[in-house]
Design a protein with these regions (language model features):
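C-terminal-biased regions
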Residues: 1-41, 52-126
Length: 126
């Protein structure tokens, strides 16, 4: 009976950690998509000051969340996202709004892709 109790406790702990990680991943991706979409809106207005401030906010948020996101995702995805975030910051400083919007949309797509690939499904589990 002791072994069964221990096994059930370990199973419940594993499930709780998995669900918690999944929820945390969703929040991280949602917050980052929101930040990047704010950059897109500012860049479409071609407002240099607002675009710079939105980029700075997104960069701060990225710095806080990228290490945790790296725990949940493939490292090649993280490398691509890191490159995109650096390019976004540089394009904002250079006031290259068309290319900035393109890179922002690509990063939003990457965050959506991470959400989709990490969503539990029969294909992902088996």
């Amino acid at each position: 009976m002791k072994r069964l109790t221990i096994a059930v406790c370990l199973l419940i702990t594993g499930i709780a950690l998995s669900v918690g990680g999944f929820i945390n991943l969703k929040f991280i991706c949602r917050d980052m998509k929101k930040s990047v979409n704010e950059i897109i809106e500012a860049a479409e207005k071609e407002d240099a000051g607002e675009t710079e401030s939105k980029c700075a906010n997104a960069e701060k948020e990225w710095d806080k969340k990228n290490s945790l996101l790296g725990v949940y995702t493939n490292h090649s995805e993280m490398d691509e996202l890191m490159m995109l975030m650096k390019q976004i910051r540089q394009l904002s400083a250079d006031k290259e709004y068309d290319e900035l919007i393109e890179k922002c949309r690509e990063s939003v797509y990457r965050f959506e892709h991470i959400e989709e690939t990490e969503t539990p499904s029969f294909g992902n589990i088996f």
